[in-house]
Structure formats: structure tokens, C-alpha cells
């Protein structure tokens, strides 16, 4: 089946990707401003909340998580279908190197929606601050760096972006659905939380693999449009995520389990 045979919705067909890419090329540096404001809000919010009782915010959190879950599920279905078709009809190299993900049917809207969504997703942290929950380094570091890198990369339509975005849509579809269920009061097995973290770790490994393939094909003189600077920043980002998520997995599920087992045996 041809990629062009994928059914487009009217809003996808009407989307002007040239205008979107042009806007990002002119405005991508605003991601630094958003990141600075985000950091300031975290520091200011935590300072203010020291003197206040925590907010419950259960219903707003359910609505927030459901909205992001629905967006991610729809995005995963649309971009996933597109990438599978590219992979099946044109092969692995084309699925990694082809820039059509940014301007082709179906995916062009979801590529732009993805990078824009990284700004409002910063709102995740607002719930942590207002509910006076533990805010770990991984959380805010991940939010800031994903925002900066996605805006920086979209403007250049770099190779590998289709896989980066599709993987993130898939992981977020599961993650935000889990958050919504937890916020709604459903009891979810701890193993499911472990599964989500493992999918995140897998995503980081795959991100590094994609970066390696892009670099390899570039060095071989094949058409795989990116630049070394982008590959370096992307690889450092994915490697840092890999280390931090592995550390989180070990501390949250391995160390804590051993600690609980030791307490029960006393």
C-alpha cells in the first residue's frame, strides 16, 4: 500500500507545513524564553507553596492527563501508521532519512503539533508544585531539553525526526493514560509503572540507534539530511536520558523493593 493511499483528514490536508516550518525557523529561539520562564515558575511556585497547604487538584489533573493522553494516542496512530507504511514500502533507510515526515500527507500536521505540544506539556510540573509532590531532576530536565531540541531540530527537518516523534507519541500515549487512571483513583499494578519506565529506557536506546544510523549514512555520502552538531546534541540528550531513567528505575523499583522486603522481615 502506498503512503499516499493513507486517508487524510481535512484538517491534515489543509495544514500549511511551509508556513509552519518558516515560523519555527524564525521563532525557535523562543524555546529558551519558555524554558527560562518555566524554571522561574518552578522556583517561585515551590517557594510560595512552602507556606501553603497543598492543593488536591484531582479533577483538573484527570482532565489534563486525559487531554494529553488523547492527543498522544491520536498522534501515535497517525504517525505510527505513516512510519510503518514508509518502512514497509521504502525500507529502513528511507524511514530514517526521508524528510517527507515533515511535509508529507498525514504526518506533516502531527510533526508540527508534536513540537508545539512540548510548550504546554511544561504544565505537568505545575501539578507537582501545587500538590507539593517530590520534584526530581529528571522531570524538569527532560521537559526543558525536549522542548529545546524539538524546536531546534524541526526548523532544519533533520533525518530521524519521524522516529523520534513517533516513539515519543507512543510512550506518552501509554504514560498519560496511566496518569489519568491514577488521578481518577484507579489502582494500577506497580508492574505497569515499571513497564512504562522500561519503554522510556527502550526509547532512549532506539534514539541513539537512529542517531548512529543517520551519522553512518551521512559519512557514507548517502542522502540523509542532518548535521553533525545536531547528531551530537541529540545523542548526548538521549544518553543522559538513558542514564537518568535507568537510575530512576533502579531507585524506584529495585532499591525500594529491597527496602520494603527488609522492613517486612524485621
Curated annotation (Swiss-Prot):
It is an enzyme of class 2 (transferase). N-Glycosylated. It catalyses: a very-long-chain acyl-CoA + malonyl-CoA + H(+) = a very-long-chain 3-oxoacyl-CoA + CO2 + CoA; hexadecanoyl-CoA + malonyl-CoA + H(+) = 3-oxooctadecanoyl-CoA + CO2 + CoA; (9Z)-hexadecenoyl-CoA + malonyl-CoA + H(+) = 3-oxo-(11Z)-octadecenoyl-CoA + CO2 + CoA; dodecanoyl-CoA + malonyl-CoA + H(+) = 3-oxotetradecanoyl-CoA + CO2 + CoA. Belongs to the ELO family. ELOVL6 subfamily. The reaction is stimulated by the presence of HSD17B12, the enzyme catalyzing the second step of the elongation cycle. The keyword Cytoplasm does not apply. PANTHER family: ELONGATION OF VERY LONG CHAIN FATTY ACIDS PROTEIN 6, FATTY ACID ACYL TRANSFERASE-RELATED. The keyword Transferase applies. GO terms for cellular component: endoplasmic reticulum; endoplasmic reticulum membrane. One of its GO terms (molecular function) is fatty acid elongase activity. Its EC number is 2.3.1.199. This is Very long chain fatty acid elongase 6. Pfam families: ELO. One of its GO terms (biological process) is fatty acid elongation, saturated fatty acid. Pathway: Lipid metabolism; fatty acid biosynthesis. InterPro entries: ELO_CS (IPR030457), ELO_fam (IPR002076), ELOVL6 (IPR033675). It is found in: Endoplasmic reticulum membrane. It comes from the Eukaryota. HAMAP family: VLCF_elongase_6. It comes from Danio rerio.
Amino acid at each position: 500500500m502506498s503512503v499516499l493511499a493513507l486517508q487524510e483528514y481535512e484538517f491534515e490536508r489543509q495544514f500549511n507545513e511551509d508556513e509552519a516550518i518558516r515560523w519555527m525557523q524564525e521563532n525557535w529561539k523562543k524555546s529558551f524564553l519558555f524554558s527560562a520562564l518555566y524554571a522561574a515558575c518552578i522556583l517561585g511556585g515551590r517557594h510560595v507553596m512552602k507556606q501553603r497547604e497543598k492543593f488536591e487538584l484531582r479533577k483538573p489533573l484527570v482532565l489534563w492527563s486525559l487531554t494529553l493522553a488523547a492527543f498522544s494516542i491520536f498522534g501515535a496512530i497517525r504517525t505510527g501508521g505513516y512510519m510503518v507504511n514508509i518502512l514497509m514500502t521504502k525500507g529502513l533507510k528511507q524511514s530514517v532519512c526521508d524528510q517527507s515526515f515533515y511535509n508529507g500527507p498525514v504526518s506533516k500536521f502531527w510533526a508540527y503539533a508534536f513540537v508545539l505540544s512540548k510548550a504546554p506539556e511544561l504544565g505537568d510540573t505545575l501539578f507537582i508544585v501545587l500538590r507539593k509532590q517530590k520534584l526530581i531532576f529528571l522531570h524538569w530536565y527532560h521537559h526543558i531539553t525536549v522542548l529545546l531540541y524539538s524546536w531546534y531540530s524541526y526548523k532544519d527537518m533533520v533525518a530521524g525526526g519521524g522516529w523520534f516523534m513517533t516513539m515519543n507519541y507512543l510512550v506518552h500515549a501509554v504514560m498519560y493514560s496511566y496518569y489519568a487512571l491514577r488521578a481518577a483513583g484507579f489502582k494500577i499494578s506497580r508492574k505497569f509503572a515499571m513497564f512504562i519506565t522500561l519503554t522510556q529506557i527502550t526509547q532512549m536506546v532506539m534514539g541513539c540507534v537512529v542517531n548512529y544510523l543517520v551519522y553512518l549514512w551521512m559519512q557514507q555520502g548517502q542522502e540523509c539530511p542532518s548535521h553533525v552538531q545536531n547528531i551530537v546534541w541529540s545523542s548526548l540528550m538521549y544518553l543522559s536520558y538513558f542514564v537518568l531513567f535507568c537510575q530512576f528505575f533502579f531507585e524506584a523499583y529495585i532499591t525500594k523493593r529491597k527496602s520494603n522486603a527488609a522492613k517486612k522481615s524485621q
